[in-house]
Amino acid sequence: MSETSEDLLRNVAKSLTNERFKLILFPTEQCNFRCLYCYENYQLPKMSNKIVESIKLFLDKRIPTLKLFELEWFGGEPLLEKRIVIEISKHAKLLCEKYNVVFHSIMTTNGYLLDIETFKELNSIGIKSYQITFDGDRENHNQFRLLANSKIGSFDKIWDNMLEIKNHCELDCVITIRCHLTSVNKASVQSLLKRIQDTFSKDNRFFIHLKEISALGGQDDDKIQHISREMKQIVVEELKNEYKELSFVDIGKDYVCYAAKPNCFLIRANGTIGKCTVALDSEINNVGRLLQDGTIEMDKEKYLSWFQGFDNLDKEILDCPYYALKRKGKF
């Protein structure tokens, strides 16, 4: 058995065990940004108090059965509803402490509202990992990641927030800086990586993830000059070799997507249960709903359809079940 297949089987085993569970929550589907390539429609408001209480009741039932619980915050921009994030996170953390369950918490945020006091508060309730995106250097980033209310750029505020964390906070955390690649922005990304290397390379809490901008259904997808998979691989290797002082992370070729895993699902701001954070408007992604008493009502046929990659360990489906199954005509 090759090392690669052992890694894949290990990831598959983690995906199938009932002792691990990952929950992705959308405290709101509103956002303070209007990124050029975003696929979301911002129609749903924040979670109601009833939905929040139902999530807490669900966690009361689920966490005692686990050895590891992972809570991920998504959106929209989750920090627009910091109160909800804090309320549910505190509840989950206390339950995990009570039942001796390992607790990991992650947030995907644009970073604009992640000031030093917010960072410290979130760290105290167990949120210690963040993904923050830049679209190249200041000039390029500010063309793509605009504020919703003024259409001005966001680079300086996000950068200043990260500097505050680096310079004035020694709390343990992992901050993954996601750098977006297109077919024409290599020089801009080089400029950004040079700036990151000069500023953050000696702080081992900061990591770099190089990721292409994908065509995910945004209304301005046609304005993005997307990079091919082959060219992306070449550019990534060149950048890694050029900026050796930075710590780069990659998902690996034996990656199993969260949406392919039976022990992971998401709850949207209205209590709808889904599998994929991208295919939000797809009917196949509407797999169930959260009931008021904290129980889950699932459409078993839809829910099980996401796990077809495990039938024969099809790596294409395990890597991205939504698009792979669409291409195969199974969605």
Enumerate the language-model features and the residues they cover:
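Short, charged low-complexity linear segments at domain edges
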Residues: 2-20, 239-245, 251, 290-304
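Conserved alpha-helical substructure of the radical SAM core
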Residues: 3-120, 125-128
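Short, solvent-exposed loop/turn segments at secondary-structure junctions
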Residues: 30, 78, 112-113, 137, ...
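Short cysteine clusters
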Residues: 31, 35-38, 257, 271, ...
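Buried hydrophobic side chains on well-structured beta-strands
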Residues: 71-73, 107, 132, 177, ...
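Radical SAM enzyme [4Fe-4S]-AdoMet core and its adjacent flexible, acidic
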Residues: 135, 139-262, 269-270
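Active-site and channel-lining beta-strand-loop segments
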Residues: 262-280
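Flexible mid-to-C-terminal extensions adjoining Fe-S/redox cofactors in radical SAM and related proteins
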Residues: 277-331
